[in-house]
Amino acid sequence: MGQVEKGKKIFVQRCAQCHTVEKAGKHKTGPNLNGILGRKTGQAAGFSYTDANRNKGITWKNETLFEYLENPKKYIPGTKMVFAGLKKQKERQDLIAYLEAATK
């Protein structure tokens, strides 16, 4: 299980330039992540996704985010997300803990 505060720091350093988490937050280069857990890939209303994201057909949950965040381009070939990923398991756990808390 990850630590929310450590995950928040990772989000601010590595994710916040492209993503927001607030309810009704705006899309940036990447989609707003509010409500991501339980949502299918490529489904944030008002965001222009690649076909690869729309067609992946998985539902975001802890396990799928954990795998995706290690190497986004490997998990969804054709995604426009330029983030290289988080190789450290603990960092991914912390980030997911933060996303769980911040995007309900």
From Swiss-Prot:
Its main location: mitochondrion. One of its GO terms (cellular component) is mitochondrial intermembrane space. InterPro entries: Cyt_c-like_dom, Cyt_c-like_dom_sf, Cyt_c_1A/1B. Transmembrane segments: none annotated. Keywords: Electron transport, Heme, Iron, Metal-binding, Mitochondrion, Respiratory chain, Transport. The keyword Heme applies. Pfam families: Cytochrom_C. The keyword RNA-binding does not apply. Belongs to the cytochrome c family. This is Cytochrome c. It comes from Asterias rubens.
